[in-house]
């Protein structure tokens, strides 16, 4: 539920001057503020970072209280955050997390949007999404490589590895979906991305994630045709409503080469524009008549999925990109809604089996050169991965930093801790101007239970078992992460996921090195453990290769 907007402009401090008692508390302070940087957040005035109503703090009073608490927090104290509000400071020890966050968690019987929204209206909860409430969102770059890897794998499986002259049709250009146009172009294919909010298109144009836009379907298709004919991939934003435009494209007989969707369908009230509604009426009625909005949005999503199914029937490779739109359509009577797969079981799970996932870091100095130096260090430490090197080169060339300079690359067990230790040494030697923080998306190998996304179609049927993210969070606390978060409902909405996050600060000290080695080994190892337990041979082999002690693993 929106709170009164605040006109303050929040940006993270830069440089080496501390505003807190140590770098271990300066790091969460800067990353909290970075989440609300106007170049990062979708609606910073409302504390909304991305993903519909994913917030960094419950309200502005809570934000100010968090900042004040972090500034006075001692090296042996831990701050507790309950759904975006600071609720306690307790004495722990120097290797304990400095901040523990629990966001949007509800007892399962009450884990639905109606109950959450009631609590939100009363000021008792907030929706943390994944990296909004856990203070490690880095702008659209945070999802670019995962999206790029998915599109590359789609091209490999469906088009012989060559996407030249092909085009992708999708929708949604918010904080997550906004990565699609750039990821598509980087993967070598043109992209037509439908978006209903002009502000989101403007944001993607301003940050370099979108090449062009129009509000005319014929012009958009003409630009796509020109791109495909030239063999030079281009991204085109189309202002409109996906549930209206996809059927029109079908009527024209135009078939894309790939199809997906990243609208905010996880939130039927705040995330999806109903058919034949304008944005202004939608925003007003979200407050005055949310039930009517939800009913209309759900019907529109069903129409959207029916169109996707028809594209699939006509031979277009079609994939759900994790926004729960298939589930809504199924609930609305689309019996075959799950006939097209989710992206994780279709393309990503083999990576998860090896603990490979979205490894990200941010330079607290604010100096882009710190990121460029770490890019080079990654290449030095992982010399035999040309795909990774290509990614880093493309990222430097194509990705504009939003807020504090940051980088993401997908690496796994055996590499993450080596990179963390190297970054820490670079801080200690002065090669980096200030500490860096290392974190990840909650979408990772061992940190999420989400039966319609990350854990869809698990081999042993354990899709809904959420012990795993709880164990991941506990393990990261015990290992010494700088802050640890446990959330509910990210990506797919209330009742459909539980997930955990961690961030570790590399401040150049020997104590940090010990924590880094534990955290950045144990965190991906828990993902290998989870998949080995589910019976995946790749994960079992990885566990044995890395000497993991898994008592239930036979042989």
Curated annotation (Swiss-Prot):
- What task does this protein carry out? Catalyzes the conversion of urocanate to 4-imidazolone-5-propionate.
Q: Which residues form the active site?
A: 409
Q: Which InterPro entries match?
A: Urocanase, Urocanase-like, Urocanase_C, Urocanase_central_sf, Urocanase_CS, Urocanase_N, Urocanase_Rossmann-like, Urocanase_sf
Entry cofactors: NAD(+)
Major place of localization? cytoplasm
The GO biological-process annotations, alphabetized, read as: L-histidine catabolic process to glutamate and formamide; L-histidine catabolic process to glutamate and formate
Annotated coiled-coil positions are: none
Q: What is this protein called?
A: Urocanate hydratase
Looking up Pfam families in the UniProt record yields: Urocanase, Urocanase_C, Urocanase_N
Kindly list the GO CC terms recorded for this protein: cytoplasm
Q: What is the originating organism of this protein?
A: Hyphomonas neptunium (strain ATCC 15444)
Question: Where does the chain bind NAD(+)?
Answer: 51-52, 129, 175-177, 195, 241-242, 262-266, 272-273, 321, 491
Q: Do you know which HAMAP family this protein is assigned to?
A: HutU
Pathway field of the UniProt record reads: Amino-acid degradation; L-histidine degradation into L-glutamate; N-formimidoyl-L-glutamate from L-histidine: step 2/3
Give the family, as the similarity comment puts it.
Belongs to the urocanase family.
């Amino acid at each position: 539920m929106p709170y009164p907007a605040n006109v303050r402009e929040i940006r993270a401090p830069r440089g080496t001057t501390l505003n807190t008692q140590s770098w271990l508390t300066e790091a969460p302070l800067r990353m909290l503020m970075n989440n609300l940087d106007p170049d990062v957040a979708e609606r910073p005035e409302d504390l909304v970072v991305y993903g519909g109503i994913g917030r960094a703090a419950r309200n502005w009073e809570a934000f100010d209280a968090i900042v004040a608490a972090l500034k006075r927090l001692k090296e042996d104290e831990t701050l507790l955050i309950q759904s975006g509000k600071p609720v306690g400071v307790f004495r722990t020890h120097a290797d304990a997390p400095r901040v523990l966050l629990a966001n949007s968690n509800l007892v399962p019987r009450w884990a639905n949007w109606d109950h959450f929204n009631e609590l939100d209206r009363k000021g008792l909860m907030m929706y943390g999404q994944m990296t909004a409430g856990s203070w490690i969102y880095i702008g659209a770059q945070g999802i670019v490589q995962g999206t790029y890897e998915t599109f590359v794998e789609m091209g490999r499986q469906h088009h012989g590895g060559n996407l030249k002259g092909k085009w992708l049709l999708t929708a949604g250009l918010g904080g997550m979906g906004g990565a699609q146009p750039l990821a598509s172009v980087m993967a070598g294919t043109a992209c037509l991305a439908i978006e209903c909010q002009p502000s989101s298109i403007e944001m993607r144009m301003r940050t370099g994630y979108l090449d062009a836009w129009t509000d005319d379907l014929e012009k958009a298709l003409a630009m796509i045709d020109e791109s495909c004919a030239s063999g030079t991939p281009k991204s085109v934003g189309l202002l409109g409503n996906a549930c209206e435009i996809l059927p029109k494209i079908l009527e024209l007989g135009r078939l894309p080469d790939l199809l997906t969707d990243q609208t905010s369908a996880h939130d039927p009230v705040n995330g999806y524009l109903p058919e034949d509604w304008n944005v202004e009426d939608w925003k007003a009625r979200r407050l005055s008549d949310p039930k009517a909005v939800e009913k209309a949005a759900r019907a529109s999503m069903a129409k959207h999925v029916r169109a996707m199914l028809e594209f699939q029937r006509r031979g277009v490779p079609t994939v759900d990109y994790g926004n729960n739109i298939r589930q809504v359509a199924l609930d609305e009577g689309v019996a075959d809604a799950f006939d097209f797969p989710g992206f994780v079981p279709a393309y990503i799970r083999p990576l998860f089996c090896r603990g490979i996932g979205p490894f990200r870091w941010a330079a607290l100095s604010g100096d882009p050169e710190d990121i460029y130096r770490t890019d080079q260090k990654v290449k030095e430490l992982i010399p035999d991965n040309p795909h990774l090197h290509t990614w880093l080169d493309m990222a430097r060339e194509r990705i504009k930093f939003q807020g504090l300079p940051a980088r993401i690359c997908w690496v796994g067990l055996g590499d993450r801790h080596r990179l963390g230790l190297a970054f820490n040494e670079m801080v200690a030697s002065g090669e980096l101007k200030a500490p860096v923080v290392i974190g990840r998306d909650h979408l990772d190998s061992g940190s999420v239970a989400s039966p319609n996304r990350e854990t869809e179609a698990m081999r042993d049927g354990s899709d809904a078992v959420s012990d795993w993210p709880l164990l991941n969070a506990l393990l990261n606390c015990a290992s010494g992460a700088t802050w640890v978060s446990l959330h509910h409902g990210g990506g797919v909405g209330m009742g459909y996921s539980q997930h955990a996050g961690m961030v570790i600060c590399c401040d150049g000290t020997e104590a940090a090195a010990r924590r880094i080695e534990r955290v950045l080994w144990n965190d991906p190892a828990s993902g290998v453990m989870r998949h080995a337990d589910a019976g995946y041979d790749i994960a079992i082999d990885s566990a044995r290769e890395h000497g993991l002690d898994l008592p239930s693993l036979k042989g």
